[in-house]
Amino acid sequence: MSALNSLPLPVVRLLAFFHEELSERRPGRVPQTVQLWVGCLLVILISMTFEIPFVALSLAVLFYGIQSNAFYTKFVAILFVVATVLEIGSLFLIYKWSYGEPLIRLIIAGPILMGCMFLMRTHRLGLVFFAVAIVAIYGQPFPAMLDYPEVVVRLTLWCIVVGLYPTLLMTLIGVLWFPSRAITQMHQALNDRLDDAISHLTNSLTPLPETRIEREALALQKLNVFCLADDANWRTQSAWWQSCVATVTYIYSTLNRYDPTSFADSQAIIEFRQKLASEINKLQHAIAEGQCWQSDWRITESEAMAARECNLENICQTLLQLGQMDPNTPPTPATKPPSMVADAFTNPDYMRYAVKTLLACLICYTFYSGVDWEGIHTCMLTCVIVANPNVGSSYQKMALRFGGAFCGAILALLFTLLVMPWLDNIVELLFVLAPIFLLGAWIATSSERSSYIGTQMVVTFALATLENVFGPVYDLVEIRDRALGIIIGTVVSAVIYTFVWPESEARTLPQKLAGALGMLSKVMRIPRQQEVTALRTYLQIRIGLHAAFNACEEMCQRVALERQLDSEERALLIERSQTVIRQGRDILHAWDATWNSAQALDNALQPDRAGQFADALEKYAAGLATALSRSPQITLEETPASQAILPTLLKQEQHVCQLFARLPDWTAPALTPATEQAQGATQ
């Protein structure tokens, strides 16, 4: 701890980031890592045995192809086969008509690249077109490097083998021999979330970060999509299982902030918590066996009173409604998403994005050809790989690519100097490569925030030490050239994406926040009663809120990297946005607490009171895009004596008023805390 205290704050944050990423535990990560690790070793063995060139490309196919579950791996494998056909076909067309004419070759390759980049952003199968763009650029240096067309044709045909045999290998490993099923991962993930919920229910624990809660909720939704596509039983009972996922997400996220020491430990409350934990355990056992859980628990009047006293009545009712739901309830028909985005041919940003990528590639190709430096051809690949929809995400990808390339180059240098002279056979080579590939595979299976580092590290290492050589290599020039090529491509891309039609998210961020607050206002308009339809709607919108707040958080991180913006305006926008996100999360949890007390009131009274909060929030959200939003000041209406609300509910709603008043004032020149207290609220 003392050593960390002496380090600069950015270094400490970087170390904390890598610690979080490397220690991440999610269902399916270990099997995916092992599959990727074994696949890499088999690729090296096969390529060295049969002298197949482009080892780095084969490894890249594995790293992009092996996914967290068998269904996703099979789907990506099919896409890779289609992409390989398109890639090689486009290359042969380019070579046929322009082999000896670099200018004509670029004229033909340019529209292909632009079309692929355009479709990558607008089509559902963008991964296919991304692969075609990569190969179209990767094959441009071949005619300049080789004077014999026959050799170029052979190398191009080898690309078919290089792309397809790793695809076959990952299908055998990840789909046929050692499949990791999505349904198994879902059962494990649901039980892990319920374990965390029980721990917070029975013990006073520090709440987990809200970003982690939201990522876990999104992970469950992604697994649900794979289960629907991969498991027939899940599809048959999909309505129950989707309700189960929503219920578990709600219990997990709500109990994360629950503190049992905040309530009196009466015997009735203790017994009720034990009963609730017992029911959750029964749900866990049913999930582990793949069965739809049915509960015969009927809450008594004393248990209902204890649940209300310790703010657990809503969780209890939500759990019981799941236990009493018919497993054969017909699912809601799913709407098929369109293959293209709605504004594909009306939004100029997509075509500008393709033009920017082409411009960056042409600049790198001109420099590469002008200096006659074959080793830096990775600069053109870099321009395609780091091309992202906006400036912030492009900078993130550049940092990941540079970091991975740097680590890979260092490992390649150490490997060439210290290890390569002592190797005599393929077995020794595999033993030495095993820990490097294992490290790269573990990093590559982390979250999207850092996974590309592992892929780039292994590919850079292979390019420098294993590419097109089938014996010991001691050439340090390869290491230098690959790293410099990546640096040149990164610099050119940074300049182009920053100053040529920069796609900033600074204007989109307030709109994104307004959308999240709009969903929160919809939650407030749902009647706070234990009615089946209302509760299911509430749970589904709540999951959407987790996704919305997480998307806003990630957008804030990207906007922070947009250095073309004025520094003060950028800092003010980020500070205000983070305050809105933080207060929005707090308002959501505070509104949850009002459900327990509001259930005891007459239905006719609640919509009027809830409508005050929803109207104020919608008005605030409507002004975010134009920076005209002021901190809402809510005056709670007095109720007639015959409809007097519970003191607990009044106190909870006053707390919501206080949270509303802490929303930032976007009309002020600088972000200052609210000085006026919300009317009707107490400190």
What is each PLM-predicted segment?
Residues 92-102, 145-151, 417-418:
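Transmembrane alpha-helix boundary signature
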